[in-house]
Regions:
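Conserved, well-structured core segments that form or line functional sites
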Residues: 2-203
Length: 203
């Protein structure tokens, strides 16, 4: 850490203004950024946008509840929920305060604290399996419901610029494992990345 508390491994933390934009733009622009939680970090290679309004696949379609209240709040906060009664999923809240929107982080490429991540994911036989998938990502990075509502512009869970940005090609596909709005092209992946979960390309 630097004297000002900065993480010398990576670039600056993304500011709130990064998230206070249309959800689709944020989802696309998150690719190549670095998700950091304490000693572990990974380059974001897959993200899905969840919109307000008519997006019935989004939790915000049910309105404001105790579970979804953070989605309707200020941007740049963590929305963490559980699926199948056991796996946490990490979303980053987008759009201006009061307008629902979030981005589900589906996969990262481990780049720091790799041994810690492997220990948390003993079932993973290959590095590309450690954090490929929403539940695997949170498990490998030690992200739990305790981080619900956390401000990702400060604290232990943040998204940073990489020190040396990579040239990446973004591929857009429909979201996966959807029962509604299944054909909406709101999944963004780093083309060619072996760390992406599910289909490496669709359509």
């Amino acid at each position: 850490m630097g004297e000002d508390g900065s993480d010398m491994r990576f670039g600056p933390i993304l500011k709130r203004s990064f998230y206070e934009r249309p959800t689709v733009e944020v989802a696309r622009d998150l690719l190549g950024k670095v998700l950091v939680h304490g000693p572990v970090a990974g380059i974001i290679v897959e993200a899905e946008a969840y919109l307000g309004g008519d997006d019935l696949a989004s939790h915000s379609a049910r309105g404001i509840t105790e579970r979804t209240r953070v989605i309707f709040g200020p941007p740049g906060h963590a929305y963490v929920y559980v699926i199948y009664g056991m796996y946490e999923c990490l979303n980053l809240v987008t759009e201006p305060d009061g307008k629902p929107g979030c981005v589900l982080l589906r996969a990262v490429e481990p780049v720091a604290g790799i041994e810690i991540m492997r220990q948390r994911r003993p079932a993973a036989k290959k590095l590309e399996e450690v954090a490929s998938g929403p539940g695997r990502l949170t498990m490998a990075m030690g992200i739990t419901r305790a981080l619900y509502g956390a401000d990702v512009t400060r604290g232990s869970l943040v998204v940073r610029e990489p020190l040396e940005p990579r040239a990446i090609e973004v591929q857009v596909t429909p979201r996966i494992n959807m029962n509604v709005c299944a054909d909406w092209p709101l999944r963004f992946i780093v083309k060619g990345s072996r760390f992406v979960s599910g289909p490496k390309s669709m359509g």
